[in-house]
C-alpha cells in the first residue's frame, strides 16, 4: 500500500478517544481497524500512534486502559513490523512493565496475557523483539502469573476436587461453626489445666519425698557447693548462701533436690548448686598468681616489646608462645585509657595553639594596615609642607631714619641678589630627599648688616 502524507497528532487522538471512551462497554472493532489503517497509511504512523496510545494507557480510569490494551494488541497484529519495533523499544517497554505490575488486577492480568501471546507468536520469528521476551522472563522470575485469576472458577474447581472429602468445608457458615466448636474445646482444655495446677505444687512435697529418702537410704551421699544465695519461701525448703557446702540426700527429682546443712534439711533448686567444690577456688588462686596487678603507666618500651613478641609468635600453634606474652599484653592494655587521655590533652593544646596563631595573624594584619595608612599620610603632608618651608620669605629689618645734616647726595639703590620664584601652578623641584629638607631658619635670606654710621642724604 502506498504511503500518504502524515496525519496530525490530533487526528490520532480524536479517533482513539472515540474508540476508548469511558462510556463504551464493548470494543469498537470498526474504529480499531480504522486506527490501524491510519497508522499503516502514515509516514510516521508508528511513532505517532504509540504516542497517542501511551496517553490512553496512563489514564486513571481502568476501563479506558483495558480498551487501550485491546487497541494496542490489534495494532500489534495488523500493523507493519515498524510498529512492533516501536512497542519493543526501550522507552515503551517501561510502560508495558508498569501495566503488567499494575495494582489494578484486571489491567495487569490483561496486559500479561497480551505479552504472553506476543511471545508465543511474533517474538519467536522476529529477533528485533528481544526486549519483549526479556520482559516476559523477568515477570516470570518475579513470580507473576500469566493465567487469568478468576475466583469463581477456582472455588468451583476446589469444590469439585474435595466433593467426597468429609473434612472439607465448602461454605462460610460451616467454617464459622467449626471455628466456634474449636474455640469452645480450647476453653475447656484451659480450665482443666488450671484445675490441675491448683491441686498440685511446683515441687514435690516433703511427704512424697520421705519414701524416696527411705528407699534411697542406701545410696551414698555427696556434697555440692552453692553458687547463689537461696532464701526459703516454704517451711520444707532449705536456705543457704553462695559458697555453702550442702550434703545431698535425694536427687530423684531433676529440678528440686533434698539436702542438709548441719541439722537443717529441706528442698532447694538443683540449678543453684554445682558438683565442683575446689575447682573455682583453685582457678581463682591460679589467676591471681598468674596475673599480678599491673600499675598503669605509659611506657613505650613495653609496647614495642609486645609488638616484637607478637611478631615472633607461631600462628600455627606448633611452637609455644613466649612466657612473658601475657604480662606484656596486660601491661599494654592497661595503657589504653592513659594514652587516650594523653592524646585528648594534646588535641586540646593543639587547638589552643591554633587559636593563638590565628589571633597573632589577625594582630599582625592590623599592624601592617596601620603602618601602611600612617606612611601614606606622612608622605602627603610632606608634599604640601616642604615647598612652604623652602620658600620662607622674611621682611627686611627696620632701619633708623636720621635727618640729613649736609647736602643730599644721590646714592645708588642697593642691589639685591636676584631670586628665582617658581611659576604659579608648577611643582617645586627638590634638590634633596623629602625627609632631609633643612629647617626654615637655615634657608632665610641674609640681609646686610646696617652700617654704624648714619647715612648722609
UniProtKB/Swiss-Prot annotation:
It is found in: Cell projection, Cilium; Endosome. GO terms for cellular component: cilium; early endosome; endosome; ESCRT-0 complex. Binds, sorts and targets the polycystin complex (lov-1 and pkd-2) for lysosomal degradation, acting on early endosomes located at the ciliary base. Functions in the germline together with the ephrin receptor (vab-1) signaling pathway to negatively regulate MAPK activation. May have a role as a positive regulator of meiotic maturation in oocytes, acting independently of vab-1. This is Signal transducing adapter molecule 1. Keywords: Cell projection, Cilium, Developmental protein, Endosome, Protein transport, SH3 domain, Transport. Residues 219-278 form the SH3 domain. Residues 366-383 form the ITAM domain. The lineage of its organism: Eukaryota, Metazoa, Ecdysozoa, Nematoda, Chromadorea. The gene is stam-1. It comes from Caenorhabditis elegans.
